[in-house]
């Protein structure tokens, strides 16, 4: 069983790049397709707490439910925002990665390098060609 978990959306380039960087470290993570299998309320609350971010910081703003529900307004409590994310998982920003070294919202994708327990096994470039890791497994930025 893997000690790394990624809350993943395969339609998202950032999420795909993050998953491939995990694999480039020699690890095969547990992949949770959170749109089909959203976290429970308790899991989501724990993820937010472990990341040390606000509930609002996890909200995706460029999706239809955000505007339809008027979530740009500050009138909603954290509990209400969590309810909206559970009802509309597309509102949960991604990818979220959990490792023994921490939990992070990996935006940009190279944030994952800060919490991987194993070094990169070789060069890595994002889908757009941007080089992130050199041949020796060293981070370029």
Swiss-Prot record:
Q: Record's InterPro entries?
A: Arsenate_reductase (IPR006659), Arsenate_reductase-like (IPR006660), Thioredoxin-like_sf (IPR036249)
Lineage, top-rank taxon, reads Bacteria
Catalytic residues, per the record, are 12 (nucleophile)
Its recorded name reads Arsenate reductase
- Role noted for this protein: Involved in resistance to arsenate. Catalyzes the reduction of arsenate [As(V)] to arsenite [As(III)].
Residues at the site labelled Important for activity: 8, 60, 94, 107
Molecular-function GO term, any one: arsenate reductase (glutaredoxin) activity
Query: What family is reported?
Result: Belongs to the ArsC family.
Name the Gene3D superfamilies for this protein: Glutaredoxin
Keyword entries, A-Z:
Arsenical resistance, Oxidoreductase, Plasmid
What EC designation does it have? Answer: 1.20.4.1
């Amino acid at each position: 069983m893997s000690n790394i978990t990624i809350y993943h959306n395969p339609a998202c380039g950032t999420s795909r790049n993050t998953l491939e960087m995990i694999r480039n470290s020699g690890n095969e993570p547990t992949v949770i397709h959170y749109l089909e299998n959203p976290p429970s309320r308790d899991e989501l609350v724990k993820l937010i707490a472990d990341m040390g971010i606000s509930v609002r910081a996890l909200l995706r703003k460029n999706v239809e439910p955000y505007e339809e529900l008027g979530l740009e307004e500050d009138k909603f409590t954290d509990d209400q925002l969590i309810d909206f994310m559970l009802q509309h998982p597309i509102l949960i920003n991604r990818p979220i990665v959990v490792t023994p070294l921490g939990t992070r919202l990996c935006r940009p994708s190279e944030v994952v390098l800060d919490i991987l327990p194993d070094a990169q096994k070789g060069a890595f470039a994002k889908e757009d060609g941007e080089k992130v890791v050199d041949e020796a497994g060293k981070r370029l930025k």
